[in-house]
């Protein structure tokens, strides 16, 4: 169809717009849009760009805090003051649909895109995390996806030179056709040295810098805004192709550019490419732009103007340059051998005007395109699923207690969701370019030193989607709380979060119920921990159609949190230090096995509520442990999560080749005591010399604590029964996942 061709409501529907949205576009323009204009609206009003089905609820999240230097959603990433004149810039985003079709490029470009969001703000990336979800690890498809995704992340990240310092990997059949690939990056910038994503200065030049533009990723935003089906393989051209070496050059050029104060605004070209960056920068600065599409460097012949507008070719950015500084900017990009081409100018009016060989092919008010502006806002139907009340009827008394707990323990430690992920993370470079403290001496959170400072950044990513499925509000509170717990256990102070909200189809009332419940839970927990939401993204339509059946994934609101370690001498690790140290649990134990790996994998029970959780209790437990760390009383700290107490004890033991001797609580079922996943529990170790001081500090009514046992030279003993040696369990733990994926 010709760029200037007239359109109809049928054309709009083919591009993914609703009939009423087409009517609104005609109303905004005061005329019928041409084909180019309709394409622009189709991507900017897609779910991926407009958040039209989520923005109403996202606005309810807490976004303010004294440490916040940028309002959520107004810049390329979140920005938080970390003291000493420095700020941490961080964000998490999804690349789920592209990774489902082309796992290597889908994951690689996800890594590239999230890092561009960081350095486009003038911050140098220092570390990456990722959160990955796959189907049954025994299936051929899952093995193909794992191999491609991990290679994509490692190839791009290792080549780009930014370490991957942590993350999480889960397997569940609900992700069989629709994996989740969520990528996080964090960087450091001087306070006041950040670059805005807003255009300003009438008459200032608009440049495109980076790679040339091709057809890869055209309509990628629209592709990410619909269900994955058996026909989705036809959408592979919507998957972008990345070049980490070009991105490295772009990073260094941008760092140099940030020093000369010649840039008035800069934005990464991600979803919807030039269309999105020009519209968001213009709307953000309340200005317009004239853009000459024939000036854009292309790498494929015969590209139509609308293809150039919608291309999602990677490693590109839009830069607004201060008038008179054009040569300074050009010299920097020439030095790094990177395309730097003037393609437009900032104008006074609110209009975005696009030209092709001096002919105007589109004219649109910028504000009408963007979320929070003229883009649609919907509130979808909500319906509580039947399973929700059914899950709450779960009765632990109907679950038989196993006669051989050791046999169960061996199975638990080798489960794909429990066992070591070294098969995956050993493919990542965890040390390049930074001082990562977590490689040799792990903490619950990843700890990255700040050059020239005694401070460090703690960062973590967490979400147990089975908990969220069982109870969206409680499950999401747990996700936020576990992030905070991990940072506290590492010696840090939680600061702020970013989120990646992965859900099914928002037009499904039960899915929308899950989504709204998750927002409520996130809001409550973030307010309690004083961790404002800096931004993130929403990824709907994560589900799979096989024949006539559509199954949404478990709701997966992935939370990434950063915290500040004010003194690296206070960093606390998880491994046992010395034989004879005493093992204490801070927080109460309940007779609870709900939604645990034990219940699902040993008893085959999928229907149960979220684990027992109380937000105030959680907060009190964390404050207690934080105080113990500050007073340098304890030797290690490790939170209890998947797999329960036994797995937590083993993880600390295996890192040090030490063992443990413990006694279970006779008032609680042994399986619940060892493998239950009730929340708000932290295992600490303390030397006998410090035990009295520990007890004195813990003798308050607000937080329960009890002696669990002591550290041994290597033997594992439970209730005076010999369970073998730590090396046996470590062999199971280290090799189980690799043996499955290599079959």
Regions found by a protein language model. Name each.
Residues 2-15, 19-21, 27-38, 177-179, ...:
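Glycine-/charge-enriched secondary-structure boundary and capping motifs
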Residues 2-5, 75-338, 342-356, 370-379, ...:
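Mobile "lid/hinge" segments at catalytic clefts and subdomain interfaces of large enzymes
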Residues 4-81, 86:
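N-terminal amphipathic, basic-rich helices that act as targeting or association modules
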Residues 16, 244, 616-619:
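Alpha-helix N-cap/helix-start motif at coil-to-helix transitions, marked by capping-box chemistry
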Residues 20, 249-252, 620:
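Generic alpha-helical secondary structure signal
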Residues 30, 261, 419-422:
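Generic alpha-helical structural signal
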Residues 42-46, 59, 271, 334, ...:
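Short amphipathic alpha-helical surface patches that mediate protein-protein
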Residues 49, 60-109, 113-115, 119, ...:
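Non-catalytic terminal/interface segments that mediate subunit docking, oligomerization
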